[in-house]
Amino acid sequence: MANNVVVLGTQWGDEGKGKIVDLLTEDAKYVVRYQGGHNAGHTLVIDGVKTVLHLIPSGILRDNVKCVIGNGVVLSPEALIKEMKPLEERGIPVRERLFISEACPLILPYHVAMDQAREIARGKKAIGTTGRGIGPAYEDKVARRGLRVGDLFDMEAFAEKLKEVMEFHNFQLVNFYKAEAVSYEEVLEQARGYAELLTSMVIDVTDELDAARKRGDKIMFEGAQGTLLDIDHGTYPYVTSSNTTAGGVAAGSGFGPRYLGYILGIAKAYCTRVGAGPFPTELYDGQEKQDPVGKHLGTVGHEFGATTGRLRRTGWFDAVAMRRAIQINSVSGFCLTKLDVLDGLKELKICTGYQMEDGSVLEVSPMAAEAFEKVTPIYETMPGWSENTFGAKSLEDLPQAAINYIKRIEELTGVPVDIISTGPDRNETIVKVHPFES
């Protein structure tokens, strides 16, 4: 039995992780975020009520769950306050159930200013960041000039460090990007309020999680974004700024890697991507590519980013990219989401290989973005189904064509599909194998 479960995306993000984390946390004591920041967008629908979380772990809607933000997360206190307010107005005791590592790097206004100024300067070569300061905050961390949550509790020393780092960033903003400088006095004043807010929630996360493990408590690690956006293993440079893969769990939480159990990979029954970057099976982007099937996927699947509101690009399921994600993460089993979006399509395609210019075939996707320019997807066509799968709760409720589609994905990837999501509500799910019971 796996007491410690990792839930992560195996595509380009937006796979539906939030719903699955919420579903599985019925059996968990802890839910831990270990990377990313408020650039994540996890949408949960419970009894018809929609909640979108960006920073707070998805387990916050479960009364019995402690939610943890690990050291690998870059924390925007401003974003945290905005997210806490509507939850607390609904009677959810966020401050009593949310715990934060003192080692979390802080996202402050100058990070946001830098992020946005850079995207403007890139013009047509823009990466498509969320403009929320994530990348610049990680840069400061690696350069060892970043301010962390723990720094807020010595305000005199914080003020000195802040002045130094803001001189560095404001020089770039004004002289290179021709943007306005960020006010040191305003940022410092905001920080004083942040210290008061965070004091009661800051803990030694490593010690807390290790004690939980020794007690036999069930712990879930909630990934943000997706494997193919990983800073090291994704389609670089069109990636996020953190390690979105299973390897990021230990580094981003301080939890011993030997104790990780089941790795649940979340994948849509088709593919989507937000922003720029390679997408071999793309059908629709709202601009140059206007395939009607791709438009169906985007419209029926409500494919708009929960964080940015941007239209997602859509395409066929890519087993080649999935094999790369499986290698990196040691995926134990899949959760296939949005199966119901495929309802009504006469035929479906799965990418089984990438053909190179020299005629050779890749079975696992390349890493660098440039390499994707030389590939042509090889498709296998399967019959679709006209029946309605929305809200199905057992395999018996699915048409045979849908079952065949799922089985083919299992065959092509070598990994079982243990969970199938057939709608946005936590109850619209088929659970073949429960990760905590595997």
From Swiss-Prot:
It catalyses: IMP + L-aspartate + GTP = N(6)-(1,2-dicarboxyethyl)-AMP + GDP + phosphate + 2 H(+). The keyword Metal-binding applies. IMP binds at residues 14-17, 39-42, 130, 144, 225, 240, 310. Pathway: Purine metabolism; AMP biosynthesis via de novo pathway; AMP from IMP: step 1/2. Its EC number is 6.3.4.4. Binds 1 Mg(2+) ion per subunit. Pfam families: Adenylsucc_synt. This is Adenylosuccinate synthetase. It comes from Vibrio vulnificus (strain CMCP6).
